[in-house]
Amino acid sequence: MNMRISSKILLFISAITLLSQSCKKDEAPQEVSYGVNPVTSLPPNAGKSKLKTDQQYVAILHANLFQVALSANQIFEISQCIESIGDKELAREVIISNFMNKSGVIMPSEAEMRADIRKFIIDTYERFLVRKPTEAEITFFTNYIKANPNVTPELVYFSFSLSNEYLYY
């Protein structure tokens, strides 16, 4: 009988020892770190929330294309033209076409564009959208320009001038 009791006591002590060792809660949970820096992910144009007025659009467009400011009278006349046409996007297309058909537009030649496409893309983004392009944008435009031999700097400038992002500052 003594043997039976001692084996039960031994079993009981073993069970308590195992349970006390296996059921310990961590004192403080450790934060898992994978060596990645925390980064706020926002779109490149997140800071642009104010819509340009017609006068601002015309003045900035002319300055981007010619690197010279328009007179107040010219800005007023062109903005009146925009307001008189019901479709503002159509009016912008006409204004950009008229500006592009004038002499004095400062843009690289097609040979210069194709010689250094990356530089052309970065310069165009900084000139029109006032920001650096993302690597995805650079890759997209590089592939697009290489794949389409009919793309000219004039078409790229035209498309940037018509982009939705260009309407905001």
Locations of regions flagged by a protein language model:
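Bacterial N-terminal signal peptides that target proteins for export
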Residues: 1-10
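Hydrophobic helical h-region of N-terminal Sec-dependent signal peptides
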Residues: 12-16
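Substrate/cofactor-recognition hotspot
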Residues: 24-169
